[in-house]
Amino acid sequence: ASDVYKRQVHHCIARQINKGADYICVADGVILNIANRNPEYLEVVNGGMFSICDSSYVPLYLKWIYGRKYQQYCGSQIFMDIVRMRKYRMFFMGTSQAVLDGLKRNLKIINPDVAAMSFYELPFKHVDDFDYRDIAKRVNKDGADIVWVALGAPKQEIFMSKLKPYLQKGVMIAVGAAFKFYSGLEEKRAPEWVVKAHLEFLYRILCNPKKQMKRCAWIVATLPGLLYSEWRRKHNGKSLIQEI
């Protein structure tokens, strides 16, 4: 993402923190696909402040359909940009305790303020079964400006939409695998040249073939029809996708 685009995103975040609670979705091909097939999930994605493009292919899809230029600003990138700022109090929630411990250990080196911030392991359960009042009570007591959520899509987006009504303040951002990338324990993000070449999906397949092959096969099988349907909606003035 360009510096100008990043500044716009961070300006919106800073402005919202003073207004109240809200959330940002970081949209990749999986989220785009589910949102176009599940009206309730689409409402969740469109119900946040805005969405940013996680996948390098999402801006290409949108350019093909709408003829507009969109920029990629992936979850792991905005995550590290905000951590490096040393500007906000943050709350980290999701994933396993081992990953959270590794994440905290590594982030303290980059931002010493992280040592005094909260890392909360969410129990493994259906998204409808969380005690959102109790979770919000923890976050509100903490006074966090930024709440990082790592539960994986589509669960994390639904989680944020359900938690929002109980929060007094804070911008929630769903960052998926970013916790794992920076914990030093599990999968790492692809090298920069791989990302720029739009080959990150191949890197992820090599690192985790069982999980990623299934996801990629599903996207490849459904994407052509999805793009054509959205193209027709756009030309009929009935697009389901808000501007990202």
Sequence positions of predicted segments:
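Short, flexible loop segments at boundaries between secondary-structure elements
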Residues: 122-127, 170-205
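Short Gly/Thr/Asp-enriched flexible loops that form oxyanion-binding sites at enzyme active sites
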Residues: 104, 157-166
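Proline-aspartate-enriched helix->loop->beta-strand connector
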Residues: 139, 143-148, 153
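Conserved beta-alpha
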Residues: 59-138, 142
